[in-house]
A protein has these predicted regions:
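Extended serine/threonine-enriched, polar tracts that run as long, contiguous segments within proteins
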Residues: 189-191, 199-208
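Structured extracytoplasmic
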Residues: 3, 15-181, 187-196
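A generic alpha-helix preference that emphasizes hydrophobic side chains
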Residues: 6-8, 27, 204
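Conserved "repeat-terminator" motif of extracellular CCP/Sushi domains
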Residues: 1-5, 9-13
Length: 217
């Protein structure tokens, strides 16, 4: 297993062992308790939902920024950031943020969302673009074994078959919201499969997912 640090982003490569791997021990605990975690455990629920949809221009390097077509517009590159998942630079060109009150009833499989706030930047707040982008996105349950994007089924990193599809590395542990959590990195065992790469934080007692970052490989 090799590690390379890029702007505080640790990139893992190489196959990990399926034996004596503490990350897999934690993953099995997640499987055991996943029906006790997530929204499906409740008949009815209420929550506040924050949604951020973003279009980015990827791989912004120094040669790109020095291109003469950007002369006089160098200020736009102050927004360049680095992905925590891939370690690559990107420039946000469209962002829509929204805040909702969500009311769900699992007994009748119905969800109602009430928009409380909305903010759009880029493309002059073009509503046609926003509608197109939102059509590309859906709500996902990360505990599901498979997640569908663009009519293709991707294996979830939390899937019971994930152990055969992903490498898992226990990278860190820390307090999140006063709860001790483990940080696990995942990446594909093989190329050219419908998979993700990223990391997640999981509670050390309930084994509920606190936070997850994913990018399609």
């Amino acid at each position: 297993k090799e590690m390379q640090e890029l702007n505080e982003v640790v990139v893992f490569t190489g196959k990990t062992s399926k034996k004596n791997n503490p990350a897999l021990d934690i993953l099995r605990k997640i499987w055991e308790r996943k029906r006790k975690n997530g929204l499906y455990q409740f008949n009815q629920y209420q929550m506040e939902k924050y949604e951020k949809i973003e279009f980015d221009m990827n791989t912004i390097d120094s040669a790109f920024m020095k291109n003469k077509i950007f002369k006089g517009m160098e200020f736009i590159f102050k927004q360049v950031d680095t992905s925590k998942v891939t370690g690559k630079t990107y420039l946000p060109i469209f962002i829509n943020e929204a805040l909702y009150d969500v009311y769900g009833d699992n007994t009748i499989k119905k969800v109602k969302e009430i928009n409380k706030a909305n903010k759009t930047s880029g493309f002059n707040g073009n509503q046609q673009i926003l509608a197109f982008v939102k059509d590309l996105y859906s709500d996902y349950n990360i505990y599901d074994n498979h997640l569908t994007f663009f009519d293709k089924s991707f294996t979830s990193p939390l899937s019971r078959t994930g152990i055969d599809v992903y490498n898992y590395v226990l990278r860190d542990s820390a307090l999140i919201d006063n709860k001790w959590c483990f940080n696990i990195v995942f990446y594909p065992r093989r190329k050219n499969e419908l998979t993700f790469k990223g990391d997640f934080w999981v509670n050390d007692t309930t084994f509920a997912i606190k936070k997850i970052n994913m990018a399609v490989t």
